[in-house]
């Protein structure tokens, strides 16, 4: 094996070791290790199952801690072992040994990159589940169809990530597609990954609804906000909330809703509107709507504290050119993020939920 390649293996091991040590400091390995010991001890106590909710929270925390602690332990041990073997193989001229070390180093690299990616989640709500609101904008039937394509795209994205996705509200379009929908996505760092998807998404294509085959431009907006739990206190003055009930829309049939079971809540001071119609009763829809309102208000206050607050309802009331984040030009096989300038040509792959290249670029650039 040539000297240049041998030296490169050594340099690679040094680089990976330095990055691992930096991650141990940044991710506060020692504190997480001690916390993991405490959590494991609690889960081993049979009494913990007397409170299933608490046990579930501990199980979730253990999974998150394991991902950091066990990975850092593996990296530290294996990099040290490989560094020792490298010196021995280098002295003995053991090419097979050096080749093995080279391969092992490349196996460890993605583990480091995954932990480094976690460093970009600085928002306190990043680890939480999230809601994704989709709303058709300018473009009529074409926009409603585009909104339904985005609904499918984010359901596919959740599937790729191993997240649980539930369509909690869906309002069909007059001709095709949807006017609006809300997805609940449950998984580790669901909000952190998807929060930069908030904004207007533009579609340019030859419309299947236009017999002349003309190109149409349409818009749909996304609004992503975290699901907050009961441990976060959000005080809402009931007099600030207007409640409207209406008949849930649907395809009909024997289960068609003949009562005003759908609920819409409007928080008057902020203009935030949430709605729910999927439950069979007004009571269940009201409970879900209030949960979403609490989540929306938490997100609103958090953004204001971080001096990042924007007019949150702009993405719903002005779904057009001015708020675009991504452009999908299907005829030219081009999807471009207008904030990061990341551009891809594999349009169907993206529409099938492969959004990682856009999301990672947004997080890395601090969008």
Curated annotation (Swiss-Prot):
One of its GO terms (molecular function) is translation release factor activity, codon specific. It comes from the Bacteria. The keyword Coiled coil does not apply. The keyword Ubl conjugation does not apply. Methylated by PrmC. Methylation increases the termination efficiency of RF2. Its main location: cytoplasm. It is found in: Cytoplasm. InterPro entries: PCRF, Pep_chain_release_fac_I, Pep_chain_release_fac_I_sf, PrfB. The modification N5-methylglutamine is found at residue 254. GO terms for cellular component: cytoplasm. Keywords: Cytoplasm, Methylation, Protein biosynthesis. HAMAP family: Rel_fac_2 (MF_00094). Belongs to the prokaryotic/mitochondrial release factor family. PANTHER family: CLASS I PEPTIDE CHAIN RELEASE FACTOR, PEPTIDE CHAIN RELEASE FACTOR 2. NCBIfam families: prfB. Peptide chain release factor 2 directs the termination of translation in response to the peptide chain termination codons UGA and UAA. This is Peptide chain release factor 2.
């Amino acid at each position: 094996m040539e000297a240049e390649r041998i030296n490169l293996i050594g340099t690679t091991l040094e680089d990976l070791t330095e990055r691992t040590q930096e991650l141990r400091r940044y991710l506060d390995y020692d504190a997480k290790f001690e916390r993991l010991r405490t959590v494991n001890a609690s889960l081993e106590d049979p009494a913990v199952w007397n409170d299933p909710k608490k046990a579930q929270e501990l199980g979730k925390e253990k999974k998150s801690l394991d991902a950091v602690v066990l990975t850092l332990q593996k990296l530290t041990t294996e990099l040290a072992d490989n560094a020792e073997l490298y010196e021995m193989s280098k002295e003995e001229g053991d090419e097979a040994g050096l080749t093995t070390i080279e391969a092992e180093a490349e196996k460890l690299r993605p583990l480091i990159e995954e932990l480094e990616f976690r460093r970009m989640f600085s928002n306190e709500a990043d680890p939480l589940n999230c809601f994704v609101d989709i709303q058709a904008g300018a473009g009529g039937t074409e926009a409603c169809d585009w909104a339904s394509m985005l609904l499918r795209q984010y359901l596919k994205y959740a599937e790729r990530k191993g997240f649980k996705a539930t369509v909690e509200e869906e309002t069909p379009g007059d001709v095709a597609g949807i006017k609006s929908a809300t997805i609940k996505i449950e998984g580790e760092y669901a909000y952190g990954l998807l929060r930069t998807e908030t904004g207007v998404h533009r579609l340019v294509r030859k419309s299947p609804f236009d017999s002349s085959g003309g190109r149409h431009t349409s818009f749909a907006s996304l609004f992503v906000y975290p699901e907050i739990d009961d441990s976060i206190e959000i005080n809402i003055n009931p007099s600030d909330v207007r409640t409207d009930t209406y008949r849930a829309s649907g395809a009909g049939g024997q289960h068609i809703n003949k009562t005003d079971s759908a609920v819409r809540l409007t928080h008057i001071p902020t203009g935030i509107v949430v709605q729910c119609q999927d439950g069979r009763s007004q009571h269940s829809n009201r409970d879900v709507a209030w949960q979403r309102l609490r989540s929306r208000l938490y997100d609103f206050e958090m953004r204001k504290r971080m001096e990042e607050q924007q007019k949150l309802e702009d993405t719903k009331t002005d779904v057009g050119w001015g708020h675009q984040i991504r452009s999908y030009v299907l005829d030219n096989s081009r999807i471009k993020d207008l904030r990061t300038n990341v551009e891809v040509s594999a349009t169907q792959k993206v529409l099938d939920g492969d959004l990682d290249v856009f999301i990672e670029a947004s997080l890395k650039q601090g969008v």
